[in-house]
Amino acid sequence: MNSKRMLLLVLFAFSLMLVERYFRNHQVEELRLSDWFHPRKRPDVITKTDWLAPVLWEGTFDRRVLEKHYRRRNITVGLAVFATGRFAEEYLRPFLHSANKHFMTGYRVIFYIMVDAFFKLPDIEPSPLRTFKAFKVGTERWWLDGPLVHVKSLGEHIASHIQDEVDFLFSMAANQVFQNEFGVETLGPLVAQLHAWWYFRNTKNFPYERRPTSAACIPFGQGDFYYGNLMVGGTPHNILDFIKEYLNGVIHDIKNGLNSTYEKHLNKYFYLNKPT
């Protein structure tokens, strides 16, 4: 009996050693903000919010540390872009070319391209890390305003398949191009972009929605930053949560005879749900 007990104890101890070794080799070490973010290098700008989220500027982050972390996580990043009419012809091709060159280079990326008509993808050098998926939005929806169609369509695709395909997702406007690397320093649960013009203005002058009956209303004397509408990012779950809140806000405003902009609803969401 003693020999059997001894054998069981030895086997149990050996099993614990195997489990410990597995987790030591496979567990991704949690990344601390101080490991890669160096706000003191840019004393000329705001580098941290009141809720201690980093505000990224060139020179404030160490991409090498982040690369080491995310390589081990084996992530996939999604980039959704929406273009209709002249936007598809004029902006979408240069956007995709620049994104293919600068967006999350070295990582798996799925481009979700949503258009209102047939769109031929530009000639882009094939890569096993790059996947392009085009979706046609039904023409019966075009009585709605553009941003509403974009957001609603994106929400449907997130719920049906995107949330199972990517770890992080960005939604961007097509009328812009990437000039430099847009890398893993931008990843986080909820990511916003400061408005380039309003950043340098007084908070009290921000063009928030001020009508009290609007779902997008931020009362006078409140608010922290003004965010631009060219980009929103985060986990698919958080993007879907924003979309639901935005659509509910639009419905609320329509019932009250109001018509606030997408950007103002976006700012209200980020006012209540702070970017990370």
UniProtKB/Swiss-Prot annotation:
Its EC number is 2.4.1.-. The active site is at E263 (nucleophile). The chain crosses the membrane at residues 7-23. Residues 1-6 are cytoplasmic. Glycans are attached at N74. Its cofactor is Mn(2+). Expressed in both healthy and inflamed gingival tissue samples at similar levels, with higher expression in the gingival connective tissue compared to gingival epithelium. Strongest expression in testis, followed by leukocytes. This is Putative glycosyltransferase 6 domain-containing protein 1. It comes from Homo sapiens (Human). The lineage of its organism: Eukaryota, Metazoa, Chordata, Craniata, Vertebrata.
